[in-house]
Amino acid sequence: MNVKHGTFKGGIHPPYRKESTAEVPLGFGKKPEMVIIPMSLHIGAPCTPIVKKGDTVFLGQRVGEPNGFVSVPVHASVSGKVIAVEERPHASGDRVMSVVIESDGLDTIDPSIKPYGTLEDMDADAIKKMVLNAGIVGLGGATFPTHVKLAIPPDKKVDCVVLNGAECEPYLTADHHLMTSQAEKVVMGLKLAMKSVGVEKGFIGVEDNKTDAIEALVKAIGNDSRLEVYSLHTKYPQGAEKQLIAAITGREVPSGALPADAGVVVMNVGTAAQIAESMITGLPLYKRYLTCTGDAIKNPQTIEIRIGVPFQSVIDQCGGFSSEPGKVISGGPMMGVTQFVTDIPVMKGTSGILCLTKESAKIATPSNCIHCGKCVGVCPIHLQPLNIAEYSQRNMWDKCESNNAMDCIECGSCSYICPAKRTLVSSIRVAKREIIAQRRKGN
């Protein structure tokens, strides 16, 4: 099979700093003594707890029931006893209702869990139902419920599924390790997704700095002519949904539209692998790969870890802090979220825990815009970040909206390239919040 090539216009080349974990063997987290399972592990309506303090639970048992279509159940990632159902700190910065489970160390699987069979055994509806029951969401970070993504509206026509294996965010190597160690499951998950939405074409996009992953996927695909691997130019944000679609299909997703409007379903390679895993074992999404890294970590590593394990436990399993951290980020340096405590749990969308020293975490003092236009040149959406940010700082929300602020994907390329060190993406993010607030008010 020939590997094809592609990229998009714009983007940046930050230091990728992936070597410290890409070249280290995958680690496997120890059995946790306690897990915290938030009722909000996905975009959409939070779940309602269906267990109470003192209950005994099995691994894989539902502990939270979804509310509404855009929601998925949450499951116990250990067997043991529920010791609390209460609000706990969450990666969003809020306190969220959570089920706290003390592990019995046995990992006794819920007896109702059975393998689903094979690809041939399952029809489209059965795949969607399995994906919902397994609590599968986008594992690239967005955590959008996957069964919703697979439920194509009648007025939309899709003709392909694209898997995102770009992993363009600096430091992170979770998807890289997944593609090299579970290539067969990634490909099987792609086939299941294709069958679910009724298409005969599938693509996997991987940045060209991951040649071993590309080789593993090509081998797993074999002679299936319906599937293709794209070697994508190493550039940030190559893994952004619209940029990935443009690089592989040449199609442009219109402003305000979704991938389905361009005839495409996009999902992360980790999501695809989990779909296959759930079919084979019957188990829900209860663990994931994540990268614990940064210059404040003693032994950076990508590790397989249970959902609900506190960040501090993951950090300790990677040797602990090498020095006092100046910043701890859930995710990567470009789009991750800074955390103020390390007792928050690993979420379904936690792709990384990035710990930076105080020196590395220093923020430069911004100065006045010099109108160099660099932010315009690198914007993958072809916006004018300098103008939108200026309007935002003047509270000119209508101007922000007319300059397409809502199309911003908040990738941070503009802030990174700005020689004046202006916090452009932060200003645009404020504008987007205000625009949404005004729309809700009907203004």
UniProtKB/Swiss-Prot annotation:
Enzyme Commission number(s): 7.2.1.2
Cofactor note: Binds 2 [4Fe-4S] clusters per subunit.
Domain 4Fe-4S ferredoxin-type stretches: 359-391, 398-428
GO biological process terms, semicolon-separated: electron transport chain
Cellular component terms (Gene Ontology): plasma membrane
Cofactor(s) named in the record: [4Fe-4S] cluster
Keywords for this protein: 4Fe-4S, Cell membrane, Electron transport, Iron, Iron-sulfur, Membrane, Metal-binding, NAD, Repeat, Translocase, Transport
Membrane topology: Peripheral membrane protein
A GO term for molecular function: electron transfer activity
Main location: membrane
Reactions catalysed according to its record: 2 reduced [2Fe-2S]-[ferredoxin] + Na(+)(in) + NAD(+) + H(+) = 2 oxidized [2Fe-2S]-[ferredoxin] + Na(+)(out) + NADH
Binding site for [4Fe-4S] cluster 1: 369, 372, 375, 418
Location of this chain's protein in the cell: Cell membrane
Function: Part of a membrane-bound complex that couples electron transfer with translocation of ions across the membrane. Couples electron transfer from reduced ferredoxin to NAD(+) with electrogenic movement of Na(+) out of the cell. Involved in caffeate respiration.
Family, as annotated: Belongs to the 4Fe4S bacterial-type ferredoxin family. RnfC subfamily.
Record's subunit section: The complex is composed of six subunits: RnfA, RnfB, RnfC, RnfD, RnfE and RnfG.
UniProt-listed PANTHER family: ION-TRANSLOCATING OXIDOREDUCTASE COMPLEX SUBUNIT C
Protein name: Na(+)-translocating ferredoxin:NAD(+) oxidoreductase complex subunit C
Species of provenance: Acetobacterium woodii (strain ATCC 29683 / DSM 1030 / JCM 2381 / KCTC 1655 / WB1)
Upper taxonomic lineage: Bacteria, Bacillati, Bacillota, Clostridia, Eubacteriales
